[in-house]
Amino acid sequence: MGLTETTLVLVSLAFFASAVAHNCQNGTRPASEEKREGCDYYCWNAETNSWDKFFFGNGERCFYNDGGEGLCQNGECHLTTDSSVPNDSDV
């Protein structure tokens, strides 16, 4: 394989990897993560052969498996529904 063919293959692979990664970035909820509890999610990184951790954007709807619902803020799910957990005003 000559230099031109090798370059073409590498450029094609880089384009494919960037197209796949485009669906998995901070603030963008991939369809595969619609049922994920909390505000973080993982996407496979083919270049490093490992999982990259991302976070939903601020204001994105989130939930807990116990039925609690909230909004993401700085990577954490802040409940907006009563979860029957004591808070400061309950003491």
From Swiss-Prot:
InterPro entries: Ixonnexin-like
First-listed, main subcellular location of the protein, grouped into a coarse class: secreted
UniProt xrefs under Pfam families: TSGP1
UniProt subcellular location: Secreted
Phenotype upon gene inactivation: (Microbial infection) RNAi-mediated knockdown results in decreased loads of B.burgdorferi (strain N40) in nymph midguts after blood feeding. Reduced transmission of B.burgdorferi from ticks to mice.
Induction trigger: Up-regulated in salivary glands following blood feeding. (Microbial infection) In B.burgdorferi-infected nymphs, up-regulated in the early phase of engorgement and down-regulated after blood feeding compared to pathogen-free nymphs.
UniProt keyword annotations, A-Z: Complement system impairing toxin, Glycoprotein, Secreted, Signal, Toxin
Free-text description of this protein's post-translational modifications in UniProt: Glycosylated; deglycosylation largely abrogates the complement inhibitory effect.
Residues of this chain annotated as glycosylated in UniProt: 26, 87
Xref: CDD domains: TSLPI_Salp14_NTD
Tissue specificity statement from the Swiss-Prot or TrEMBL entry: Nymph salivary gland (at protein level). Saliva (at protein level). Not detected in midgut.
Position of the signal peptide: 1-21
Miscellaneous note of the record: Immunization of mice against the protein reduces B.burgdorferi loads in mouse tissues after infection and acquisition of parasites from Borrelia-infected hosts by ticks.
Protein family (similarity comment): Belongs to the salp14 family.
Role according to the record: Inhibits the lectin pathway of complement system activation in the host by reducing binding of mannose-binding lectin and L-ficolin to their ligands. Does not affect the classical and alternative pathways of complement system activation in the host.
Protein's name in the database: Salivary lectin pathway inhibitor
Organism: Ixodes scapularis (Black-legged tick)
